[in-house]
Regions:
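A general structural signal marking secondary-structure boundaries and capping sites
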Residues: 5, 60, 64-71, 98, ...
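Conserved NTP-binding catalytic cores of kinases and kinase-like/nucleotidyltransferase enzymes
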Residues: 1-20, 25-29, 39-44, 129, ...
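ATP/Mg2+ or Mg2+-diphosphate-binding catalytic cores
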Residues: 221-290, 295
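Active-site activation/catalytic loop segments of kinase-like enzymes and analogous catalytic loops
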Residues: 92-101, 161-197, 210-230, 242-250
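An alpha-helical support segment within catalytic cores of ATP-dependent transferases
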Residues: 68-80, 85, 90-130, 196, ...
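Active-site acidic catalytic loop and adjacent metal/ATP-binding pocket
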Residues: 63-64, 117-165, 175-179
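C-terminal accessory "lid"/substrate-recognition subdomains
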Residues: 291-330
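ATP-binding pocket architecture of kinase catalytic cores
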Residues: 1-88, 93, 100
Length: 330
């Protein structure tokens, strides 16, 4: 990665026995820290925070595509490649660590058949790209200029680039709005064009939805294990937002796995996973957060204008202009 000048920390020195090494200090500010205001405000990100997200998502194809060139994937641990076996492992992790804890009755054989169809679809397109595996805001450091640097990619392997995009944008705790996700997918797609051939927008969106579904089930399996079996409250609290992602995903897409979808819909209907609407906290930086509609206007009036600090308006702009009828005088 260093040879390709990717935004990753440089290894400065390695001990003779290769058990210790020194690497570049990237500071203490992560993207997760920088996005705290928008995250705690219920997903209402300001312009600066959105710019950080755009910078990050534009750099992701650089790591995925250029980072894969000349990389010996046989050295990747614990898996050299994203394959059917690893997908089935994660799907069964979801089944045993989450689904079975809900006491929903389901047919094991029918669900397994759909799992195999799903796994085959996820792995049918072979790609020469680096799958970061744990691409999240906590693993992105920011320098003084706000440029992203990537860490904790040691679990990476060869695999489809859709996976990392799904992991990043559909992380439940981030609370990204549908509009913001769409904008960031757009930024990623057009950045990807700079590094490799890309499929049509329609095909890209269809493939991405499969990986969003897979990543959601994978996350629920992890939350189930950490929360229900290891009794860690943070992971239990993270389950309802993840279920909401699943609920929206099933509503917006038609997946060709009828029995699996049937079981997943039963999960989303369970009362313990109902989303409880919480009022967003006011931001410490003065960015206005309100549950009210601050855009009241007649459609013919054009877009509304308002102050982000008090939600009041309209903004009045007076324009003065002049011209020289016979040109600029001498």
């Amino acid at each position: 990665f260093d040879q390709r000048r990717l935004p990753v920390p440089k290894v400065l020195a390695v001990s003779d026995d290769e058990l210790c090494y020194l690497q570049q200090d990237l500071g203490s500010v992560s993207l997760f820290d920088a996005l705290k205001g928008g995250r705690e405000a219920g997903g209402r990100y300001n312009v600066k925070e959105k710019e950080l997200l755009i910078r990050t998502i534009r750099q992701l194809p650089n790591v995925q595509i250029r980072g894969a060139r000349g990389l010996d994937f046989t050295q990747c641990y614990p898996q050299p490649e994203f394959n059917t076996d690893s997908v089935l492992f994660d799907l069964n992790y979801f089944k045993y660590c989450f689904l079975k804890t809900t006491d929903i009755d389901f047919n094991e054989l029918k669900l397994e058949a759909n799992f195999r169809m799903f796994a085959n679809d996820l792995t049918e397109e072979k790609m020469e790209s680096f799958l970061y595996r744990d691409f999240q805001a906590r693993n992105i450091m920011l320098d003084a200029k706000g440029n992203p640097w990537f860490i904790d990619f040691q679990g990476g392997r060869k695999g489809p680039y859709y996976y990392d995009l799904a992991s990043f944008l559909w992380q439940a705790s981030a609370k990204y709005s549908h509009k913001l996700r769409r904008e960031l997918v757009y930024e990623y797609y057009y950045s990807l064009k700079n590094y490799t051939e890309v499929p049509s927008v329609r095909h890209f969106a269809q493939r991405l939805s499969l990986f969003v579904l897979f990543r959601t089930l994978q996350v629920l399996g992890a939350y189930g294990f950490r929360g229900y079996f290891e009794h860690k409250k943070h992971f239990i609290d993270s389950i309802p937002p993840a279920i909401q992602n699943l609920r929206e995903l099933l509503h917006d897409n038609k997946f060709p796995y009828p029995y699996m979808v049937e079981v997943l819909e039963k999960i989303t209907q369970l009362p313990q996973f109902a989303m409880i609407e919480q009022a967003a906290a006011n931001r410490s930086d003065g960015y206005k957060v309100t549950d009210k509609n601050i855009y009241p206007a007649h459609p013919q009036d054009g877009p509304a204008t308002f102050s982000k600090y008090d939600g009041k308006g309209p903004l009045v702009v007076t324009v003065y202009s002049f011209s020289y009828r016979k040109g600029i005088p001498d």
